[in-house]
Amino acid sequence: MNKSGYDVNYATQIYEVKATDNSITVYATNQWIGNRGMTLGGPVLEITFTSTLADSIKVTIEHYKGAVKKGPDFTLYEDANFKPVINEKDEYWELVSNKTSVRIGKAGGAWDIKYFYDGKLLTKEGWRTTSYIEEQPWLTDYRMEGTKAERFYAHASTDEPARIREMLNISVGENIYGFGEKFSTFVKNGQTVEVWNNDGGTCSEQTYKSIPFYVSSRNYGVFVNHPENVTFEVASETVSKVAFSVQGERMEYFVMGGKTIADVLGVYTTLTGKPALPPAYTFGLWLTTSFTTNYDEETVSFFIDEMARRDIPLEVFHFDCFWMKEFNWCDFTWDKRMFPDPKAMLARLKEKKIEICVWINPYIAQQSSLFDEGVKNG
């Protein structure tokens, strides 16, 4: 049963397949086409499979290719010279990227997509998985009645009435991990995950480090290449599937295979960028003021001196957000009530061979003078 206000059009029939030297494109109808008249109505999805990096399959689902792509976009390190292998066999089309491959079934034209690594099935799609979802006009009007701020924080920042949804099968005993820093259980099965940043603390499903990427205990990963809101239903809406959806006429995602999860992460970071190696001291012991505790320079000095007295090596001391004055974050100004001479304090800590880390937030509160400066200068 579909939720009231939505029309769901599933990729039902593989109506036509076109192959080039580096891609396979499938045209999927939302119904079985029995005669020419049935081609006159209903959405047709254009799904392209290609590979721009070894052991990754790039999937692009498009309903209307003329939609304006406004950005922003993730920076990806794709290899324009990489060429997958395209095979046509009696039972399926196949695109091979090193040891990872996708097969598009031919049997009767039914929607049948399978992903493999070194011959082992990773995940698949079948009946009622890929879909184009249309929001009925009355619901769009109702949703857009809120203020701009309300729509933004409700994840609905546009009046786009369409949505693309994909669903990939998961097996019995398969566990899903990822989506960035989350404060729910480590295994994400059974959860609805919104990839949308909020300053929600550490005690709820909200998070400030969201990433539209997950890995499976079956040694594959899925990266949804959309920096906007992405909704994941991890064995929650349908217990045997991971569903993910984005607003608009287009979706792009990558399926990555490997022998181990570490291999999958290697493919992912090759695509999205690998972090630099941090300084050696960052691998040592850190000590923090914690979040809402009351602390000042005397408290900090006591903590550090006690670590030395107990012969506990300390590399980094972290000041949480209250190094700044409350309701002023983040203006990069020390709270002089608690830290009257921060320059001298930091010099003393440096003499003790302690590195310093301070917490920052990606906004400036209204009570800070910098807020007025920002308003004045646009």
Segments predicted by a language model, with ranges:
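Acidic/polar N-terminal loop/beta-strand segments that form early-domain functional surfaces
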Residues: 29, 52, 62-64, 216, ...
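A generic "cationic amphipathic patch" detector
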Residues: 56, 61-62, 70-72, 226, ...
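Generic, ordered loop/turn and secondary-structure boundary motif
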Residues: 75-77, 178-180, 184, 197, ...
